[in-house]
Protein backbone atom coordinates (compact mmCIF):
# COMPACT_ATOMS: atom_id res chain seq x y z
CA UNK A 1 0.00 0.00 0.00
CA UNK A 2 1.31 3.47 -0.88
CA UNK A 3 1.50 6.55 1.26
CA UNK A 4 -1.84 7.88 2.45
CA UNK A 5 -2.36 11.51 1.52
CA UNK A 6 -3.42 13.96 4.23
CA UNK A 7 -6.25 16.30 3.27
CA UNK A 8 -6.29 19.82 4.73
CA UNK A 9 -9.53 21.49 5.75
CA UNK A 10 -8.77 24.37 3.36
CA UNK A 11 -8.70 21.86 0.46
CA UNK A 12 -12.25 20.90 1.36
CA UNK A 13 -13.60 24.37 2.09
CA UNK A 14 -11.68 26.05 -0.76
CA UNK A 15 -11.05 29.02 1.56
CA UNK A 16 -9.13 29.96 4.69
CA UNK A 17 -12.15 29.87 7.03
CA UNK A 18 -11.41 26.26 8.00
CA UNK A 19 -15.14 25.69 8.40
CA UNK A 20 -17.87 24.73 5.94
CA UNK A 21 -21.41 23.35 5.75
CA UNK A 22 -22.41 21.60 2.53
CA UNK A 23 -25.38 19.73 1.16
CA UNK A 24 -24.18 16.33 0.04
CA UNK A 25 -25.18 17.06 -3.58
CA UNK A 26 -22.79 20.05 -3.56
CA UNK A 27 -20.06 17.93 -1.96
CA UNK A 28 -20.23 15.01 -4.48
CA UNK A 29 -17.46 16.30 -6.80
CA UNK A 30 -15.06 16.49 -3.86
CA UNK A 31 -16.22 13.10 -2.52
CA UNK A 32 -15.38 11.50 -5.87
CA UNK A 33 -11.79 12.73 -5.52
CA UNK A 34 -11.68 11.09 -2.08
CA UNK A 35 -12.74 7.61 -3.14
CA UNK A 36 -9.20 6.50 -2.26
CA UNK A 37 -7.93 6.26 1.34
CA UNK A 38 -6.97 9.67 2.76
CA UNK A 39 -6.19 11.06 6.20
CA UNK A 40 -8.25 13.90 7.66
CA UNK A 41 -6.49 16.88 9.24
CA UNK A 42 -9.92 18.23 10.18
CA UNK A 43 -13.15 17.07 11.77
CA UNK A 44 -16.19 16.04 9.73
CA UNK A 45 -19.81 15.45 10.71
CA UNK A 46 -22.13 13.78 8.20
CA UNK A 47 -25.89 14.08 8.78
CA UNK A 48 -27.49 11.58 6.40
CA UNK A 49 -31.24 12.09 6.01
CA UNK A 50 -32.09 9.65 3.21
CA UNK A 51 -30.88 6.48 1.52
CA UNK A 52 -27.93 4.22 2.27
CA UNK A 53 -24.22 4.38 1.63
CA UNK A 54 -20.91 3.12 2.96
CA UNK A 55 -17.44 4.30 3.80
CA UNK A 56 -14.22 2.98 5.27
CA UNK A 57 -13.04 4.51 8.54
CA UNK A 58 -9.58 3.35 9.62
CA UNK A 59 -9.97 0.51 7.06
CA UNK A 60 -13.22 -0.80 8.57
CA UNK A 61 -16.42 -0.61 6.55
CA UNK A 62 -19.09 1.58 8.13
CA UNK A 63 -22.65 1.77 6.91
CA UNK A 64 -24.29 5.12 6.29
CA UNK A 65 -27.94 4.64 7.21
CA UNK A 66 -30.90 7.01 6.79
CA UNK A 67 -31.33 9.46 9.69
CA UNK A 68 -27.80 8.82 10.96
CA UNK A 69 -24.86 10.93 12.09
CA UNK A 70 -21.24 9.99 11.40
CA UNK A 71 -18.36 11.82 13.10
CA UNK A 72 -14.78 11.71 11.84
CA UNK A 73 -11.93 13.11 13.88
CA UNK A 74 -8.54 14.53 13.05
CA UNK A 75 -6.07 11.88 11.91
CA UNK A 76 -8.56 9.18 10.93
CA UNK A 77 -8.15 7.41 7.62
CA UNK A 78 -11.26 7.68 5.49
CA UNK A 79 -12.49 6.46 2.12
CA UNK A 80 -15.87 7.06 0.49
CA UNK A 81 -17.21 3.80 -0.98
CA UNK A 82 -20.91 4.20 -1.85
CA UNK A 83 -22.14 7.76 -1.50
CA UNK A 84 -24.07 8.56 -4.68
CA UNK A 85 -27.51 8.22 -3.07
CA UNK A 86 -27.02 9.72 0.37
CA UNK A 87 -28.80 13.01 1.07
CA UNK A 88 -27.99 15.30 3.93
CA UNK A 89 -25.33 17.71 5.15
CA UNK A 90 -21.61 17.64 5.82
CA UNK A 91 -19.87 19.95 8.28
CA UNK A 92 -16.07 20.25 8.18
CA UNK A 93 -13.93 22.24 10.61
CA UNK A 94 -10.56 22.49 12.33
CA UNK A 95 -9.89 23.01 16.05
Task: Name each model feature, range by range.
Residues 75-95:
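Ligand-binding loop in jelly-roll beta-barrel domains
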Residues 49-53, 73-75, 84:
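Short, solvent-exposed loop/edge-beta patches enriched in aromatic
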Residues 1-56, 60-63:
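Generic protein-terminus/edge-of-domain signal
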Residues 39, 71, 92:
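Short aromatic/basic micro-patch
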Amino acid sequence: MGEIKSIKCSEVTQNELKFGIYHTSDFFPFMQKLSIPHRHNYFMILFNEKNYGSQLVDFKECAIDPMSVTCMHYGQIHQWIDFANIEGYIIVFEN
